[in-house]
Every structure is written in C-alpha cells, then in structure tokens.
Amino acid sequence: MITLALSKGRIFEETLPLLRAAGIEVLEDPEKSRKLILTTNQPNVRVLVVRASDVPTYVQYGGADLGITGKDTLLEHGSDGLYQPLDLQIAKCRISVAVRADFDYASAVKQGSRLRVATKYVAISREFFAAKGVHVDLIKLYGSMELAPLVGLSDAIVDLVSTGNTLKANHLVEVEHIMDISSRLVVNQAALKLKQAPIRKIIDAFASAISQ
C-alpha cells in the first residue's frame, strides 16, 4: 500500500492532474466527503487528507509514504528525514512583508526601530529580519493576518501572497519580497527503500508531467 498525504484546497486541486499522469484517480471529493482516507482507482494507493502544516510530520514519521506540501511549510517544519525529489511547480505564491499603506516601513527600518511583526512563519521571519539586521518582536498568529496591523497589534505582517487582492482590500501594501513558494513532493526515506519500485514510478510520472 502506498499512502499519499495531501491537504484540502488549492494544493489538492492542482495535484489531481499530476496523479492522473501517474494513472491515479482519486474516487472521492475531499470537499464533499467527510472521510479522511480517500480511495483511488489503484487498489494499492490511498490518499490521506490532513492539515497542510501536518503533511511533513505524517511523511517524516511514516504515517504516509509521500506527501505534497508548500516550501513554506517545509521551512517552518524542518525537513529532517524527508527526501525532496521534485519541485512540482504548483500552488505558486510568495512570502512577503506587508504593512498599512500609511506606515513608513522604510524609515522605521532605517532608524533602527524595533518592529512588531505578526506571522505564522516565525522561523522564516526570524531568519529574514536577522539577515537584514532589523530588530523585531514576532507575534505568532494562525490566521486573519491582515487584521493585526489594522487594530494596532503589529506594525507589519509576514504572510503568503498570491494575487495581493486581500492585502489591497484591507489597505495593506507589500514592502518586501522574502521568497517565492511552490509545492514540493516529499518522500519518507525508509519507505523509498522498502517500496522503491512503486514510489519511483510515481516520482517519474510527476517529473514527466511537470516537464511538459
């Protein structure tokens, strides 16, 4: 049995064509089904529906053989024990620093002000600001990041940005681009040794699909 860990939403939808390229069709819609283990047209392949932030953990500890997760999640989680054979080039976005439109971020940084930054990407933010020599107090949030500057909780946020429409709707502007993000295929290294042929077949099919 090959077990693939996926999260609902954009990554799941953009993974379906890659699975089809590997001859795998998911037989149930995760948005409609309450099941957390989904069957496929391949009797030896199943899909686990987990939180995006939990995908690396399931793969690392053997709950799943493979998983698909964003580069952002891997950087926050750490990638010990995970083999990363492919950048799948799906679910593309970026991690950016954003502030209220009326906040002079450049002056605050230049003056050496200590900034309060709200984010769920604490590790990424800490490394980024440390490299720039900017002093920050990081506030860990799990959602609705755009709210933090609007109510005075923070001076800035570090968050995923896709179109930028949510920032604009909340009168925020991007002031720094930290990195581009896309989703990666991650593989449990022990599973790769024990189930090499079927896992390699999936990896090769994905690689062929993204090169077209």
Curated annotation (Swiss-Prot):
Pfam families: HisG (PF01634)
GO CC annotations, alphabetized: cytoplasm
The keyword Transferase is assigned to this record: yes
Pathway: Amino-acid biosynthesis; L-histidine biosynthesis; L-histidine from 5-phospho-alpha-D-ribose 1-diphosphate: step 1/9
Enzyme kind, highest EC tier: transferase
Biological role stated in the UniProt entry: Catalyzes the condensation of ATP and 5-phosphoribose 1-diphosphate to form N'-(5'-phosphoribosyl)-ATP (PR-ATP). Has a crucial role in the pathway because the rate of histidine biosynthesis seems to be controlled primarily by regulation of HisG enzymatic activity.
NCBIfam families: hisG
Protein name stated in the entry: ATP phosphoribosyltransferase
